[in-house]
Swiss-Prot record:
The keyword Hydrolase is assigned to this record: yes
A Pfam family recorded for this sequence: DLH
The reaction(s) this protein catalyses: 2-(5-oxo-2,5-dihydrofuran-2-ylidene)acetate + H2O = 4-oxohex-2-enedioate + H(+)
EC id: 3.1.1.45
Alphabetical keyword list: Hydrolase
Positions annotated as active site in the UniProt record: 118, 167, 199
A GO molecular-function annotation: carboxymethylenebutenolidase activity
UniProt similarity note: Belongs to the dienelactone hydrolase family.
Protein known as: Putative carboxymethylenebutenolidase
Hydrolase is among the record's keywords: yes
Amino acid sequence: MGQMVEFEKNGVKVRGYIATPKWAGPAVLVFHEWWGLESPLSNIKEICDKLADEGFVAFAPDFYKGQYADNPDDAGKLMTEMFEKRMDEVDRIFQASVEFVKECRYTYPKKVGITGFCCGGTLAMYFAAKFPEMVDASLPFYGLPQLTQINAENIKVPIFFILAEKDEFVNNDEVIDIAKTVWKNGVDVQVKVFSGVTHAFLNEKREDVYDPKRACEAWELAVNFFKTYLK
């Protein structure tokens, strides 16, 4: 089990959840869904714990700074405010988080992967494009590219897009177009569309959409991806 922590880097205050492995390992930043890190509907802390069990230092920054939602209306408001008004602050939180995990005594080698779910998947695309020098691999789960500008031509690191066939929020064709742009630049790109499932199918706290079989398959792919490019 991990724990909530707070720290300050270069004047940027960050709070988040960290889980560490038994021995040293590379780091993975995990970006929360529109619910927020502390929401009872979020499984991001559990994702961090599972990554630690696989040998990674996992840190989930709280981009909502303690706020969270337990219903779609409030979640939408928090997410929209973040993408429309707070992206400069979100950038600084990300940069501080990278520094934090690289300085962690459990992090070795000093490599950093990023992943996220829902709007966190959007951020996993966005940061890979905006800060390619700070990222070693990216794995967005059903990210929504329409939420912010994704400069796909700037993505220089291996990236794996995991999508849901029946996702009512994500236009999978738009994500695949991003993947094609990255591939044309000679970057290692993978895309997996899981059939018969919808948005958030990995979230065991959402019984209405959770698919244990597909979730297990997707998780195995994710772990193998990070072990390939970070270790």
